[in-house]
């Protein structure tokens, strides 16, 4: 047995030394493998297998999930959603109006927001004082810029896509013809992403806190001034697709070429700032300029007429027939219901217009203009006529000298016209206006106006008191001259 002398002792006291078995820390005989030469694994006595060190998360993951980019996406989402919700009455029920307002919101809100957000993100290295640290890493300046800029660009594009999806879902229950313009929304999303990258590049080149503000203001001013102009240069405005409701459709490649114009500028700026060979920036710049030339040269040809806007759907069971534009055929039952009182009173009357028409032209002879239903948000909201009595009154006005700029030549004809209109479409608002004028004329002692108003009341009472057959016959003679601006007094029947 081995013995060990304890220090400080006299050497006579012995302590047994631990045996080999006692030194064994792995009595079960289990061994762990460790890598050896030539890929061979050797056993390591005792202990657990060595854990591999956890790899650091990819920088893109951190940019995607934390920091400024998600908050910027949420901010743009709220801004665009608020803009659409505030004017929901003006686009729900019309694919064209929905597309137009989404494009306008993207141009006037999304583009300035993306430029400012990108600029703020691009200047963060200067604010954090980490520019020198980043320059010492193995990644190239181009990779560093893209890693920081692309997550923000994708978040902003995703915010726009979510707002578009919500708007289309809100429009679909009330729209009855046409469909969404998906290339417009795809082009606008790409343009917003390009604006974020362009703003990021400017923020890196001019890394000051106030750089974002001039970019946002400049984006808004350019979009508002140039985009609403009359020259063909307006087609260069980012995201602003120039259509007018349901009457025009953007050609399918227009939004994509517009996105190429923005993306080319962004790519040229990125390469000019970060590439080792700055001349490579000329390639995307040439693509951007080519897209710009194509947009300006094509001009109004970028928008074509909607074939549906030249057609009508009609209800031939009424007198006159009622036709609405084929871009919103679902409004026909609602319009027919709103005009049911008017058409019921005209049943059996001769010399009426054949139909109410709803095309973008002056009515032909034998037609009357249907009161306008567009733009959405005035006479019609979400597939309903907002004020049926007012709408019927407007439709009655279209039957009696609607295109005449001067009053009839004699007062008797004017009195007769007023009596007929009051009988065809009684309107509480018109009645209140008449009472106001009557009261004012009495207070001012205006005998001429009092006499005219009393004559109109008497004519209306005589027309109302007529038997139905006699009234239909009288109205037939009256409507024989109702479209003439200066009929002979002898041709207009009196009351």
Language-model segment annotations:
Residues 112-119, 128, 163, 195, ...:
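Alpha-helical transmembrane segments of polytopic integral membrane proteins
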Residues 195, 332-335:
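Solvent-exposed, acidic/flexible segments
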Residues 1-118, 125, 268-284, 294-304, ...:
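Hydrophobic alpha-helical transmembrane segments
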Residues 117-154:
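Helix-loop-helix units of permease transmembrane domains in multi-pass membrane transporters
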Residues 249-260, 272-290:
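Amide-forming acyltransferase catalytic core, primarily the GNAT-like/NAT-type
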Residues 394-396:
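Small-residue-enriched transmembrane helix-hairpin modules in multi-pass membrane proteins
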Residues 134-135, 139, 143, 203-208, ...:
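Membrane-interface helix-boundary motifs at transmembrane edges
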Residues 54-56, 61-97, 144-268:
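Hydrophobic alpha-helical segments
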